[in-house]
From Swiss-Prot:
Gene3D superfamilies: 3.30.2130.30, RNA methyltransferase domain (HRMD) like (3.30.750.80), Vaccinia Virus protein VP39 (3.40.50.150). GO terms for molecular function: 23S rRNA (guanine(2445)-N(2))-methyltransferase activity; RNA binding; rRNA (guanine-N7-)-methyltransferase activity. It catalyses: guanosine(2445) in 23S rRNA + S-adenosyl-L-methionine = N(2)-methylguanosine(2445) in 23S rRNA + S-adenosyl-L-homocysteine + H(+); guanosine(2069) in 23S rRNA + S-adenosyl-L-methionine = N(2)-methylguanosine(2069) in 23S rRNA + S-adenosyl-L-homocysteine + H(+). Disulfide bonds: none annotated. HAMAP family: 23SrRNA_methyltr_KL. It is found in: Cytoplasm. This is Ribosomal RNA large subunit methyltransferase K/L. PANTHER family: RIBOSOMAL RNA LARGE SUBUNIT METHYLTRANSFERASE K/L (PTHR47313), RIBOSOMAL RNA LARGE SUBUNIT METHYLTRANSFERASE K_L (PTHR47313:SF1). It comes from Hydrogenovibrio crunogenus (strain DSM 25203 / XCL-2) (Thiomicrospira crunogena). PROSITE patterns: THUMP.
């Protein structure tokens, strides 16, 4: 078994993991710069031949910890280099990272080179030559503080260099492996297999076209340069295995070419098309890929095209004064797509997310990408009328995007500026508190100006940074609906600039009193989950699929209280929702736990919260139960008692799996009394409710229990403007 490291462009880690799995890789661990994985030599060879995403595949020779810089030479010399490098051959060394006083890559490479040379001089009295341009072998060293990794570069060149663009100068090219990743995200392999066509209406140098053909024909991207890879000069090379894999790849390509779907490209620039023709010819697809000079606004399909996939990378408009020109390009592209490509899929890459609005089609999904150092966004579309943006503003999740497109001047009005100033003032007041407490999700505005009745929450996610969730409190019937809408749009218009976030990451929701099943109503099917950190616990949130996000932010300190009490104890979490309180308690040292909820959806969500924190589900159990029925049974002859119980029931609930209803004001005495039967001798129960007019019947529990109102101490600073958001009590046996 060998250890390998695959480098890849930033942001492709998860796609790379999926790809490496298809090669037979095991123990894959992604990093910002790529992924380590285990496998036999065949897995490494397949990665060199078939990876469409990796830059380089390294065979790891040594991983060790260095006590000091001086130890580097002896560690390098401890490797039997005669198994890897011909003593009469040539080699080169590259180096990355820093540590132990090594801060320059050239110096690190020089130290490793000297160690290899000294090894050969000591054992063979001869040494291989250094050739930094075309060596037989490339050795790579990486130092992370005191952790040294020495590897062989199996290809010797970046695998994104397929060979079809060599010698071709392209302005601001999209790397081949980034283009391949975009095609993967857009599901091109599946579409091609079903016979769908491919079209790039702004094909430029033709990178998408060639990569689409390579994928659709099942061509290994490394096969054309298989003879140039440095693994051919490695002394540990298995020539027969390599030739077998190369022949297999060539056979697969021959079969794949027979089933290649139609691939088309067009561009307004004849110079770009000349470059594209050269690339297409070099790749061997000049009889397969059809290109044509044509502006988007002149666009018409020129043949019988089966519905398939459109992918393009429109101009970014980086130069001063180009913004309006680029906006017009997006408008025309959107008109072209809607007029000619109904029932197709599309994927558009842009580094200015607001430009996507001008296509006039709502994106179904989006993904972060990097074109070099430039942060970009890939928008994926289904070109169906139901996804076309309507000219009138609609109170939907993408309301901020709509306002930006249809009422771009609204943010300059006096009322909008007033809302902006209030939010900025709130943010300034919370800034030090957020930083001191390492808070990544919090409320920044809660109807501070009564006429602008919104709740605005910020979520700083690990995956993609800041998201803004805006909930509107449904206005009373006495309020003029037109005026209420106007105020809503004014508030939404300033949010992108206030939070310095693209409107696509501002999610709007309408709040109203929830009844019965409404509280669990699914709003969408995007299934886009993100991760935040609270009290050193990773928690999964979802901004689009439900009215709620998976975490109640006002309960932040309630969860902290539960976690503190449960350290080293047994915890019962009733109506656990997504079990955020349990996850935080386990991170704080909870010995064992049982978390119950009736919703399969939320328990599945809770399971992912547990997975994010490596929580043992045998020790910490998630169980789907009608909590009221479970309590009825569990309290008849209680055997399992708990040291800490967290009881946070809904204010009102009905369900298909539940007979009758739960009304917390009416039923709280019976519910709490049953729950207390499961409390150990010195146990504690925290009861919490969000019912604003709730009154606790303390007399029903005294004098057997000491009851402490902990509402004020569990109310976080970001909810100080709304002290009725929840109430909480701590029950202790007298």
């Amino acid at each position: 078994m060998c250890r390998f490291f695959a480098t890849a462009p930033k942001g492709l880690n998860e796609l790379l993991r999926e790809e490496l799995t298809t090669f037979g890789a095991e123990n894959i661990k992604t990093q910002p710069t790529g992924a380590t994985f285990d496998g036999d030599l065949e897995v490494g060879y397949r990665s060199c031949l078939w990876s469409r995403l990796a830059n380089r595949i390294y065979l790891v020779l040594l991983e060790t910890e260095l006590p000091n810089q001086e130890a580097l030479s002896s560690v390098v010399q401890s490797i039997d280099w005669s198994k890897h490098i011909d003593k009469e051959g040539t080699f080169a060394v590259s180096f990355s990272g820093q540590g132990l006083g090594i801060t320059h890559s050239h110096y690190g490479a020089l130290k490793i080179k000297d160690g290899i040379v000294d090894y050969f001089r000591e054992h063979y009295q001869v040494r291989p030559s250094i050739d930094t341009e075309v060596p037989d072998i490339r050795v790579h060293g990486h130092l992370n503080r005191n952790q040294l990794t020495l590897s062989l570069d199996l290809s010797g060149y970046s695998l994104h260099q397929r060979g079809y663009r060599e010698g071709i100068q392209v302005e601001a090219p999209l790397k081949e492996n980034v283009a391949a990743a975009i095609l993967m995200r857009a599901n091109w392999p599946e579409i091609a297999q079903q016979g769908g066509a491919f079209y790039d209406p702004m094909c430029g140098s033709g990178t998408f076209l060639v990569e689409a053909a390579l994928m659709a024909s099942d061509t290994a991207p490394g096969v054309a340069k298989s003879g140039e890879m440095l693994l051919n000069y490695w002394l540990g090379h298995d020539e027969s295995l390599w030739q077998k894999l190369v022949e297999e790849a060539e056979q697969r390509e021959q079969v794949g070419l027979k089933h290649l779907p139609n691939i088309y490209g067009s561009d307004i620039s004849h110079k770009s098309l000349d470059v594209a023709r050269n690339s297409i010819q070099a790749a061997g697809y000049d009889d397969v890929i059809e290109i044509k000079q044509m502006a988007v606004e002149q666009g018409r399909k020129w043949g019988d095209w089966s519905p398939g996939l459109i992918v393009c990378n429109p101009p970014y408009g980086e130069r001063l004064g180009e913004e309006e020109t680029v906006k017009q390009i997006y408008l025309k592209l959107g008109e072209y797509l809607k007029a000619e490509f109904i029932h197709w899929k599309a994927a558009i890459l842009t580094c200015h997310t607001e430009l996507g609005m001008f296509l006039g089609i709502k994106a179904k999904r989006s993904h972060d990408f990097f074109n070099g150092a430039m942060s970009c966004r890939l928008f994926r579309f289904e070109i169906e009328e139901e996804w076309f943006r309507q000219p009138a503003l609609q109170p939907k999740q993408d309301l901020a995007e709509q306002v930006l497109q249809l009422q771009p001047d609204l943010a300059d009005t006096d009322n909008a500026k007033m809302v902006s100033n209030r939010i900025r003032k709130n943010m300034k007041g919370l800034k030090s508190w957020v930083k001191q407490n390492d808070i990544s999700a919090y409320r920044v505005y809660d109807a501070d100006i009564p006429e602008y009745a919104l709740a605005i929450d910020l979520y700083d996610t690990l995956e993609s940074g800041l998201w803004v969730v805006v909930a509107e409190y449904a206005p009373p019937k006495t309020v003029n609906p037109t005026k209420a809408k106007r105020r809503l749009y004014e508030a939404m218009s300033v949010l992108p600039s206030v939070f310095n976030v693209s409107p696509e990451r501002i999610v709007f929701k309408v709040r109203s009193q929830q009844k019965g099943q409404d509280q669990y109503e699914r709003l969408d099917e995007q299934k886009a989950f993100f991760t935040i950190v609270e009290n050193q616990t990773r928690l999964r949130v979802n901004f689009t699929d439900y009215l709620d996000t998976g975490i109640f932010l006002d309960h932040r300190q309630v969860r902290q209280e539960v976690a503190k009490l449960a350290a080293g104890k047994r915890l019962l979490n009733l109506f656990c929702y997504t079990a955020t309180a349990t996850a935080e308690a386990v991170k704080a040292g909870c010995k064992s736990s049982l978390s119950l909820d009736m919703s399969k959806t939320y328990l599945y969500w809770a399971k992912h919260n547990f997975m994010c924190n490596d929580i043992n589900e045998k020790q910490h159990v998630l169980q789907q139960e009608n909590v009221l029925e479970w309590l009825e049974t569990a309290t008849q002859n209680p055997k399992d008692l708990f040291d800490v119980i967290f009881l946070d029931p809904p204010s009102f609930s009905t369900s298909k799996r539940m007979d009758g209803t739960l009304d917390i004001q009416r039923d709280h005495v019976d519910l709490i009394q049953k729950t207390l039967k499961l409390l150990s001798k010195d146990g504690k129960l925290i009861f919490s409710t969000n019912l604003r007019k709730f009154k606790l019947d303390k007399a029903s529990f005294e004098p057997d229990y000491q009851i402490e109102n902990i509402t004020q101490r569990t109310m976080p600073k970001d909810y100080a403007r709304n002290m009725k958001i929840h109430q909480a009590w701590l029950f202790s046996r007298q």
